[in-house]
Amino acid sequence: MEPSVLLLLALLVGFLLLLARGHPKSRGNFPPGPRPLPLLGNLLQMDRGGLLKSLIQLREKYGDVFTVHLGPRPVVMLCGTDTIREALVGQAEAFSGRGTVAVVEPTFKEYGVIFANGERWKTLRRFSLATMRDFGMGKRSVEERIQEEAQCLVEELRKSQGAPLDPTFLFQCITANVICSIVFGERFEYTDRQFLRLLELFYQTFSLISSFSSQMFELFSGFLKYFPGAHRQISKNLQELLDYIGHSVERHKATLDPSVPRDFIDIYLLRMEKEKSNQNAEFHHQNLMMSVLSLFFVGTETSSTTLHYGFLLMLKYPHVTEKVQKEIDQVIGSHRLPTLDDRTKMPYSDAVIHEIQRFSDLIPIGVPHRVTKDTLFRGYLLPKNTEVYPILSSALHDPQYFEQPDSFNPDQFLDANGALKKSEAFLPFSTGQIFDQKSVGKRICLGESIARSELFLFFTSILQNFSVASHVAPKDIDLTPKESGIGKIPPTYQICFLAR
């Protein structure tokens, strides 16, 4: 072998040994996990079926708390309801940091309410929660907006006259319009060209973030960022969305009336003006843009995708659909709109919606957290800034809380008397949770209350007016998602809405 080749190999081996020795794992007492390779981490343990499948397999060997090296960085995985709640609720402050999502980090850069950390996050979170509540989070004003959108949807579905259609677009329209009315102060017609482009960007971006390519990027972003891939299209899409938001902000500035704020953007602009003399204020243009993008994106895709899964499940299990419609007929009838007050009188319908969220498992791997200080957890010392992934799928499919964790069965949310039964394992959107309008956990999804209202009112409004059918027999309907990464993308399907 040539001396130059031997020298190169020796230098490479020495470099890899230095990397292994200097690994941050030595700074703490991390949970057990598979032995990593220098630079590659645990790539060899990653199943082609996706990151979630790999993590579930590793849990069987290492338990509910284990370490996986995503490329060169150690990440602690939390599995099971009790483990997740012990960390993110029992030690909420320590686990309240936000970890990095590599495919969107170049856009957000720790700005905005979802990806911010420290005092910036606390300030933006307080402001956003208060503002969303002022504009009716869980109150009548948002209920009326959802009811209005539900009626627009019903009229649109009547036009189909029972012909098969793909519901993806319409479900995006209704959920996007609700969040648009709160954030931008307006709703769009379903034929509006700008609106259609925004919806296309949302769907494509969520699909790309959930792709296998993006999962690989999370492992080796430091290297792969220099090459073409899904991450570049994601950044391009997010920039186009930001361009639209920027134009909207400028229109708001030109028409702002301080005595009558119209929406989230107006209230933020007023706060910016109030604190413009404060050099350390977090109310600046960058945080406004990223907060609006976060609310806009999450407020559209999570609810619309849940509805998409929900009606596929209604086609798969027609006996469930019939029971929901029977309850709708008994409680609401056919001559008035469903209201949020109806929910407490409709435990079966509410249980079905809960089970749709649980079974569809939309965000199987929760958005990463980060410990804000050196943290002792279950005998392990996690150094400050250690990333932590809550595997929400392991809670939603937890056999300690659900008798049939891998089956669709709404009865799992009903007690012996037929009343709705709440479960601590029900964590469909985030590691926060709402019980009787009280949040549990620090990183609760800001729009969760709105999403709950949307799902109930849209779901019952549709089944009040339509029966659903498919040309595919229920037993042949495939529930396998198209993509399953950070999020799940349901399969496309055709559905007939038949007027009742």
From Swiss-Prot:
InterPro entries in the record: Cyt_P450 (IPR001128), Cyt_P450_E_grp-I (IPR002401), Cyt_P450_E_grp-I_CYP2B-like (IPR008068), Cyt_P450_sf (IPR036396), Cytochrome_P450_fam2 (IPR050182)
Reported induction: Up-regulated by cannabidiol.
Cofactor: heme
Signal sequence annotation: none
Subcellular location: Endoplasmic reticulum membrane; Microsome membrane
Residues binding heme: C445
Short name of one Pfam family: p450
Principal EC category: oxidoreductase
UniProt entry keywords in alphabetical sequence: Endoplasmic reticulum, Heme, Iron, Membrane, Metal-binding, Microsome, Monooxygenase, Oxidoreductase, Phosphoprotein
EC nos: 1.14.14.1
Record's bilayer topology term: Peripheral membrane protein
Residue numbers of Phosphoserine PTMs: S128
One GO cellular component term: endoplasmic reticulum membrane
Catalytically driven reaction(s): an organic molecule + reduced [NADPH--hemoprotein reductase] + O2 = an alcohol + oxidized [NADPH--hemoprotein reductase] + H2O + H(+)
Alphabetical list of SUPFAM superfamilies matching this protein: Cytochrome P450
Gene Ontology molecular function: any one: iron ion binding
GO BP of this protein: response to bacterium
Highest taxon, organism lineage: Eukaryota
Chain's role: Cytochromes P450 are a group of heme-thiolate monooxygenases. In liver microsomes, this enzyme is involved in an NADPH-dependent electron transport pathway. It oxidizes a variety of structurally unrelated compounds, including steroids, fatty acids, and xenobiotics.
PANTHER family referenced in this protein's UniProt entry, alphabetically: CYTOCHROME P450 2B6, CYTOCHROME P450 508A4-RELATED
Family membership: Belongs to the cytochrome P450 family.
Protein name per Swiss-Prot or TrEMBL: Cytochrome P450 2B10
Species assigned in the record: Mus musculus
Gene from which the chain derives: Cyp2b10
